[in-house]
Amino acid sequence: MKTIDIHTHGIGGYDTRTTVEDHILKIAGIHGAHGISEIIPTIYPATLRVMRENMLVVKKAMERQKADLSYQPSAISHEKIEKTPILEPATITGIHLEGPFLNPNKCGSLNAMTLIAPTESNFLELIEGFEDLIRIITVAPELDGADKLIRRIADMGIITSMGHSDATYAETEAGFKSGAKGITHIFNAMREFHHREPGILGFGLMNDDVYIEVIADPYHLDPKTIELIFRLKNPERIIIISDSVRESKAFAPSPVAVPGWRTGAGVTDMRGRLLGGSMTITEAAKRLIDAGYDEEIVTRCITENPERYLL
C-alpha cells in the first residue's frame, strides 16, 4: 500500500525554491524515512521564469531517480504507519503548482506580488515543456478567466484544485462543473463560512464528490475542526497532506532555527503567521488514529484516496 503526499514544498532544510536537484532528492529521502512512498513536490508562486526553473530541477531529480536501477519505492501496511522507518526515498511522481493563478487577498504566507491573471497565454508560458509532469494546479475559481482555464487544464488531463480563494459557493460550484476536482488545504487561505454565504468552504464540506486537502497537524486546524470535517465530509474524498516546508523537521536547539521563522507552535514567521505544515502525512495520520479516529478511514486518507484522486 502506497502512502502519497500530494502537497509538500520541502522538509528538513530544503524546498522547491532551488536550482539544485540534490535538494529535491533530499526532500524525497526525508519523506521516505518517515514512511512516505510517493510525493508530489509543490512549487511556490513566483515569476514564470523562476517557477519554470524550479520545475526543471524537479524534472531532473525525477530523471535521476528513474535512472537509479537499484531504487525501489517505499510501501507500508496500515500497522506500520510511523512505527518502522523506511530508508528508501519517496518516489517523485510529478509536480503540484500552487499558483500563480490565486487570489492575492487570500495569499496566506505566499507572496501576493507574484500572483497573476489566469490567462491562456500566462498558462501556456508557464507549463510549456512540463505538460507531462504537472499533476495538480491550484487555481482560485472566482478570478476572471478561471472557468475557461480550468476547462483547459482538465482537457489536458491535469487536476485543478481550488484554493487561495475568496470564492462564493456558486463560484466554487462553477469551478467544479468546469472540471476542478479538489480544494487545496480546506479552511486555510480561503473565504470563511458565513450562514448567508457558505463559500468555497461550505462547498468543500457539503459536496460529496469534490476532494479536499486537510493539513492535520495541531496548528492549522483545531481538533474540533478536524472532527467536523470527518463528521460532515465523504471520507472517500478526504486527503491528508503535509503542506510541509523547508523549516519542517529542521530542528535546532533554539526556538529560532533560521532567521525569520520559528518552530514550536508550528512553523511560523516572526509575526506568528503559519508558513506550512509541521508534520509528515504519516505522523498526522498516526496522531488522528491515536486520538480515536477509525484507523482504516484515516489510512485511506493517505493511501487510497490520493491514489484515486490522481487517476
For each feature predicted by the language model, list its residue ranges:
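Residue-level marker for buried hydrophobic side chains located in beta-strands
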Residues: 2-4, 161, 238-241
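Active-site-adjacent C-terminal substructures of enzyme catalytic domains
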Residues: 171-297
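Short, basic, low-complexity termini and linkers enriched in Ser/Thr/Gly/Pro
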Residues: 65-89, 254-259
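Active-site mouth loops of central-metabolism enzymes
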Residues: 10-22, 43, 109-116, 159-163
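Divalent metal-binding pocket/active-site signature
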Residues: 97, 104-199
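Active-site glycine- and acidic-residue-rich loops that bind
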Residues: 48-53, 142-144, 161-165, 215-232
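Divalent metal-dependent hydrolysis catalytic cores, especially in the metallo-beta-lactamase
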Residues: 9, 25-57, 90-103, 130-142, ...
